[in-house]
Amino acid sequence: MSVRSVLTGDAALRAGAEAGLRWRAADPLLPAPAPLHPECDAELAVAAPGGELLAIGSCAHWLGDPDALDLTWGAASRFELSARVAGPAGPAVTDALDRLLGRWRGHLASLPSAAAADTAAVIHWPSRDVSGAAALLRRGFAPLAVIAARATAAGARAAAGAGSAVGPKASAPPEGVRIRRATPDDLEALVRLGLEVIRFDAHFGGVRERPSTVAALTAEFAAMLAEPQPWMWLAERGSDPVGMLAAEKPAQAQWIAPMTGIAPAAYLLLMGVRASERGGGVGAALASTMATEAEAAGTSVILLHYAQVNPLSAPFWSQQGYRPLWTCWEGRPAGALR
């Protein structure tokens, strides 16, 4: 039986449907599981003694462009598993995922490229589907990053039960600070503040400043600033830039939109505040400015990434109404899974 026939057969569809029921019970902002497509030749499936399919996966390989900004956000070579585990939350899900990860480990062990230092085995698992955590830890994965979500009022209505994701009331900037929409003349300041964020996040194992990072970030911000009414803001104390925020409108955020079940989705790419200004309300005012504009534009949900172990990110984004939607688990190098 071919990998394609396994991934698209009735048993795989049933496993995906059961996983979807578990996801929605855990978090109404999650999407329905998408059908799996064969992107490697490994048959990743786990069955019960009677033949019932318990878990199935599809693996893919991403090799970074050395000049692209994407390379800054993780390993240069990423092996990613999309997993569908059948059944309700509980020990059976943990066991089935553990066995599936073991099969994937065997596949990666057969690939010489997975043993290189700048590689990662990656799996996105719903943050509130806690049945997967023990299996991932057992196999040598670490929770490096989070995709967090903040539903707007309209988005919360669309996803029944997600009302707790709606953010706080609008925050005004602290005294002496003004927030304005960025212009092309602000490019240098935006890049400088953005690099501070990247360099701080690099302490936590996910983000890496590359030789191409400055040029790639400059090109990314320049392209965003060329759009009409860009979702980019600068916070200034007097004439001194002290904070920035860059976000993608739903039209530009299609790449991450499938990670949630409500639409349209925007993406907060990067927000940074000068270290001397942290804790004073600049970041909250920037996040509030972006959320207000996104809601006025009809956005249902805002997504963003933050480093799981960054001691500043998790409490800050929680205070702004964001909560974990997906956890990005990584094993580095990819061939070193247990």
PLM features: residue spans?
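Conserved acetyl-CoA-binding loop-helix of GNAT-fold acetyltransferases
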Residues: 90-110, 270-273, 279-292, 296, ...
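Conserved GNAT-family N-acetyltransferase fold
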Residues: 57-59, 146, 233, 243-247, ...
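Acyl-donor-binding surface of acyltransferase catalytic domains
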Residues: 86-175, 326-333
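Conserved active-site alpha-helix within GNAT-family acetyltransferase domains
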Residues: 127-143, 284, 296-297, 308-326
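A short beta-loop-alpha structural element at the N-terminal edge
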Residues: 1-17, 178-193
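Conserved donor-binding loop and adjoining core beta-sheet/short helix segment
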Residues: 31-103, 242-264
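Flexible, substrate/cofactor-facing loop regions flanked by secondary structure
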Residues: 169, 174-266
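Conserved GNAT-fold acetyl-CoA-binding loop/helix
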Residues: 7-40, 201-220
